[in-house]
Each structure stands twice: as structure tokens, then as C-alpha cells.
Amino acid sequence: MKKPITLAAAAIVGALLAFILIPDNKSAPTFSLTDLHGQTVNNAGLQGKVTFINFWFPSCPGCVSEMPKVIKMANGYQGKDFQVLGIAEPIDPVESVHQYVKEYGLPFTVMYDEGGTVGKAFGTQVYPTSVLINKKGEVLKTFVGEPDFNKLYQEIDQELAK
């Protein structure tokens, strides 16, 4: 009896999150963060590129589980008008983020959202959460949990073809 109740509760939470997160085709929230190398990253860097923003942290099991696929995606779209941005949430200390990035050789820009303000602006409450943004800086889709990467690749390819 507990299993159907748990599944129903999960479905309700998922439905509520769909209303909390940024609606599709709205401009991405304004943000400015410093990456792990000291460079400023902000909304201006979204223009002209399809962007996948991944909100994560190193001790998050789901985040760690999907990270090899995010790395593969970043490598697979190198040289195209596509970028991955990793925004580490302040659940873990910044030192853990640096260690994880170094250990796994993340091939994309990673920032530490020290105050959690960017995650809040994007409506993240569950991790991992990822956002696909078009070349105009508009949110195309928000993924709570690991996305279906095959479908994600199709969406990226469609946007790159525009």
C-alpha cells in the first residue's frame, strides 16, 4: 500500500514543480557569476548559442549519475554554437566542487552559486535540474532530474539548425 502512495506523492510533486519552474520561451533570468577560473559569466554569454545549464553539486547522487552523460554531450557538440554551463549549488563547499571538476575533467565552464541566488532565480528546488536555452536567451525546456538524453540531443540539433 505504501508504494502507490509514494508514487502518487511523487507525481504530485512533479506536477507542482512544473508550475514553479520558469515557463518555456521566457527569457532566462539575469545572472552573473564567476567561474572557477575567475572569469565572469552572465546572460550576455547566452546570446548566439544553444546553452544547457546544469544545476548540481558533488554529493548529489543524481547529479553524479548524470554527469558522464553531460560530459559526453559537451564533448560531442564542441565546435558548434552550443555550450554547457555547470552551476554548482552551495550545498557542498566550493573546495569539493574544485576537487570534483579536477578529478573528472569537466570540459565545460563551472561556476559556484555561493548564495544560491541563480538557482533560486531559475526556480531550482530539486537536483539535478537543467535548463535548455535557445540562441536568443529564452528558456526552451527545464528538466528536473536526469533528462532523456536522446530526446535532448534531438532538441539541441533542431535549435542548432535554426
Name each model feature, range by range.
Residues S65-Y104, E114-K120:
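Structural microenvironment flanking redox-active thiols in thiol-disulfide oxidoreductases
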Residues Q47-K49, G79, L106-P107, T124-Q125:
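Active-site acidic short loop of glycosyltransferases
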Residues Q99-L106, E114-D157:
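Thiol/disulfide oxidoreductase modules built on the thioredoxin-like
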Residues F31-T51:
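A short beta-strand-turn-helix
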Residues F52-I53, V84, S130:
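Hydrophobic beta-strand anchors of alpha/beta hydrolase catalytic cores
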Residues M1-T34, K162:
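N-terminal targeting signals for export/organelle localization
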Residues K49-T51, F55-S59, V126:
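Short pre-active-site segment immediately N-terminal to redox-active cysteine/selenocysteine motifs
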